[in-house]
Regions:
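Active-site-proximal specificity loops/subdomain of glycosyltransferases
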Residues: 1-30
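Small-molecule pocket liners
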Residues: 17, 56, 95-96
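A structural signal for short coil/turn segments at secondary-structure junctions
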Residues: 28-29, 53, 141
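Short aromatic/hydrophobic "clamp" motif used to bind/position activated sugar donors
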Residues: 33
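Catalytic metal- and UDP-sugar-binding loop of GT-A-like glycosyltransferases, i.e.
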Residues: 36
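Conserved donor-nucleotide/metal-binding helix-loop-beta segment in metal-dependent transferases, i.e.
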Residues: 40-81
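Long, low-complexity C-terminal extensions of enzymes
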Residues: 166-210
Length: 210
């Protein structure tokens, strides 16, 4: 119940990811862990990601400038909790991938819990969902000398659809491991991949997915 928010809160269900990671840390024994959104397709092994987990917490860094609407709102939330030094410019991390060693994730989730409690004490439930909490915790983690790294070598967020014409090569040239397909891509491309698997029992070849 640590991250319980009103049902009508924007991105209310996304807060469940914080609860899920906290539960896994408390109830499962493991060396390293990675939490992924469900609207993803993993196309390569995660061997290199596991190597980095021992050295840092890994999060997907969203390529947003400090003034981008969502990024600025996340920073304003932090300003409300820590007015000294405001205005802050937090790095915008997404919640589609959170990975690290058990020790590093335990420390990081403690920061998440404390930061969310401070937000709630100020009467703030971020409309930006779990991402606001990851970002605040990551900022504090870096200030404390506990590294947080961009996981963009392993995952990328591909917004596709009528409003997005996206050109990229990182799915096949020095390819990322995980394709994150939110929004329209979840309703079309990801569904086509799944339907192919359901019919044949194997995923389509990568050249067809691309």
């Amino acid at each position: 119940t640590t991250y319980r928010v009103p049902a009508d809160t924007n991105w209310a269900l996304a807060y469940y990811k914080l609860c899920a990671m906290a539960w896994v840390l408390e109830n499962r024994d493991f060396t390293r862990a990675a939490m992924l959104d469900l609207d993803t397709f993993t196309q390569r092994p995660l061997d290199d990601l596991w190597r980095e987990c021992d050295e840092a917490v890994l999060l997907y860094q969203v390529p947003h400038a400090a003034s981008q609407t969502m990024t600025a709102a996340i920073s304003h939330c932090f300003d409300a909790v820590e007015p000294d030094g405001a205005p802050h410019a937090l790095t915008h991390f997404g919640g589609e991938l959170v990975a690290g060693s058990k020790a590093r994730l335990t420390d990081f989730m403690s920061l998440c819990r404390d930061y969310f409690k401070e937000l709630q004490a100020k009467g703030i439930t971020p409309r930006e969902g779990d991402e606001a909490v990851w970002c605040g915790a990551a900022y504090r983690s870096l200030l404390a000398g506990k590294p947080v790294r961009a996981a963009n070598a392993y995952i990328f967020r591909y917004w596709l659809g009528v409003h997005f014409y996206y050109v990229s090569t990182n799915y096949t040239l020095d390819p990322v491991c995980i394709l994150h397909l939110p929004g329209a891509a979840k309703d079309r491309q990801l569904k086509l991949i799944y339907n192919g698997y359901a019919r044949r029992g194997v995923f389509p070849p990568l050249n067809k997915i691309y």
